[in-house]
Structure formats: C-alpha cells, structure tokens
Amino acid sequence: NDYQSPQSADAIEYKLNASDNQLVADTYRQKYIDVMDTVLSAIRTKRYGQVMSFFTFEGLDVFNELIAYGTARIVGDGKVNFFQGASGRVSARGLQMSFSFNVGRNGKKTFVEDVVFTFNEDCKIENVSFGLGEQSTNDILCREAPGWNNATREVLTTFLENYKTAYSLKRLDYIKTIYSDSAVIIVGNVVRPKPANTSSSEMSISANGQNIISYNRYDKDSYLANLKRVFANNEFINIRFTNNEIQWLEKFEDRKVFAINIGQEYSSSRYADSGYLFLLVDMT
C-alpha cells in the first residue's frame, strides 16, 4: 500500500495562498487535511459511505460519477496541494488518478488525470473535476493581459476544468447549461483516406492521401441530440487539453467576453483525433 497519511509532511505539500502569498492558518488548514485524508482512504479501500458527509449534494453526485469512470485508482504518492483562490474557495490539487477501460477482447485503455477537489466556505467538497494539466493551467494562471486578474484566471480555469469533466463523465444536463440557446456549434471530424482501389469520385475527398476534416454545423438542440447519441455509443470519452490562447475581446466594453482557443486531444472507444476547441465565453 503506497498510501501516506496526510499528517506526514511527505504526503501533503503545504502551498502558499495563490492570491496573496500567505499560508492558510494552521487550524483552518487542518480541516481540509482531515477531509482529504478520509477521502483518499475511501478511494483506496472503496468504502465511500464514510465520506458522504464531506460533500454537498452536487459535489457527491460528481464524485460518484468520477469514481465510476472505468476502474479508478490513486497513483503516485498521493500528494495534495492546497490553494485558496481570489473567490476565497480552497481547492485541493495535485492528486493523480488512473482510469482504465477494457478495449476489445484483451486490450486496455488507461487515462491518468489530475483530480481537483473544490471546497465551499463550510469546508464541504462542492465540486470534483479533472484538471487541465500543467501546460494549460500555467498558460492561464501565468498570463498577463488587459482585462486579466486573479479572479478572471480562477473563473476561466474552473470553467475549462468543468467543461472537460462534463464531456468525460457524459454529464449532458450540465453541458446544456454551458451553451446559450442561440449558440452555433461547429464540430470537425477526420475523414480517413480512401483505399487506393476506390473510385475516382470517392478519392476526390482526399488530396494526395491526406486526411480531410469534415465539418458539421449545429444549433444547440441538434448538437445536444447528437451528443446524446455519441455518449450512448461510446463506453468512454476522454478529453486532454494542451496549449491554449485566451483573449479578452475588448470591443464588448460592458461585458467580459473571452475567446478561448485550446489544443484538444479527443479519445473515445470508437474514435480519436487531435484538433482545437474554440469557444466564445461570456464571463459577465
């Protein structure tokens, strides 16, 4: 058993407050340590009943979905870092978990994810999400640009973490709340080159054997209906974000609208590709 008690200095690395470089008071911090100690133990032993009281209703719902995502287990040393953001919420970051799925007769697909636990002001876990990864997180948290402050960085990071988690856990009801009713959603798919013996008319979709991207345009309702079918037809879906560019669109003077362009590696039991996700997000 590679579990280390969070009371050990080797198991928990106490980080500075991300907003003002002040350590959380020892008595205040200890509450979070005790909660995470019990949660980590429950994940390892699969005795989840003992931690239900540490979650809000919504937080417990997401936690139950996350631990049912394939075969879940903690990997690494179980080290957790505590951060207090501009909103005052405390998040426990750095925990790595692996999630494995059987593929075909003898195959296995495993994803390793950073898992983030977010606490409310009553020290209850109100949300659990997959982290963005070091590169994407640093691109947001270290960015200096007009319209940016610590609150903006926190909101954007949280939004993208929840977005990624919702698709992986097939949380269609949550995804419905992300898009506006007037949203236009364009989805691209890689069309594989046709074999050499196909007709000339069929070959016209592929130039010199290169992959072609097929685009489909949806309104919100048709996109969600299609996404529901995708969720039903795939045992697993996983999204991994890489580099990103985020810009505040200053022309919306009375609103905080951000253009997000982020590298995305999409993997499912039936299809996989790499591309870019572009979102216009109104943070007003």
Question: Predicted segments — roles?
Answer:
Residues 1-45, 124-169, 177:
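Short, low-complexity N-terminal intrinsically disordered segments enriched in polar/charged residues
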Residues 3, 14, 28, 32, ...:
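Sequence-level detector for tyrosine residue identity
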Residues 3-5, 10, 104-152, 251-261, ...:
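Short beta-strand edge/turn micro-motifs at domain boundaries
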Residues 4-7, 22, 30, 50, ...:
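Residue-identity detector for glutamine
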Residues 13-16, 53, 62-65, 71-72, ...:
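Generic preference for hydrophobic/aromatic residues in regular secondary structure cores
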Residues 34-67, 170-198:
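Short, well-ordered alpha-helical segments enriched in acidic and aromatic residues
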Residues 59-118, 199-274:
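Surface-exposed, charged secondary-structure patches
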Residues 129-216, 220-244, 248-253:
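Acidic, serine/threonine- and glycine-rich low-complexity intrinsically disordered segments
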